[in-house]
Curated annotation (Swiss-Prot):
Binds to 23S rRNA. Forms part of two intersubunit bridges in the 70S ribosome. This is Large ribosomal subunit protein uL14. Keywords: Ribonucleoprotein, Ribosomal protein, RNA-binding, rRNA-binding. GO terms for cellular component: cytosolic large ribosomal subunit. InterPro entries: Ribosomal_uL14, Ribosomal_uL14_bac-type, Ribosomal_uL14_CS, Ribosomal_uL14_sf. SMART domains: Ribosomal_L14 (SM01374). The gene is rplN.
Length: 122
């Protein structure tokens, strides 16, 4: 469950290390975002000489959350950290690699590029 002011790790090689959610997209009064949702983020920490700089505003897809993700079969999956992947306007990832596992729910939301780049899909 991600809301405004939430800090997330970045799970790709775009150059950003930490980002902060500044808007949850999808509705005028929407407060929370979960796995597979798109948010607007501000880069708070970045690597030097990277594609993205500190202070840049980008869209991101949430790939891991500390909050439980419930499946239809009754199983639950949760992670140790909140993480996102930076995407462009056409919802394609900015980076060329994804670090760490991502959830299977991204497939249903149409993020096949992220699924194919991820080393593990849970």
């Amino acid at each position: 469950m991600i809301q405004m002011q939430s800090n997330l790790d970045v799970a790709d090689n775009s150059g950003a290390k930490r980002v902060q959610c500044i808007k949850v997209l999808g509705g005028s009064k929407r407060r929370f975002a979960g796995v597979g949702d798109i948010i607007v983020v501000s880069v708070k920490e970045a690597q030097p000489r990277a594609r993205v700089k500190k202070g840049d505003v980008h869209r991101a897809v949430i790939v891991r959350t500390k909050k439980d993700v419930r499946r239809t079969d009754g199983s639950v999956i949760r992670f140790d950290s909140n993480a996102a992947v930076l995407v462009g306007k056409n919802e394609e990832p900015i980076g060329t690699r994804i670090f760490g596992p991502v959830v299977r729910e991204l497939r249903g939301k149409g993020f096949m590029k992220i699924i194919s780049l991820a080393p593990e899909v849970l």
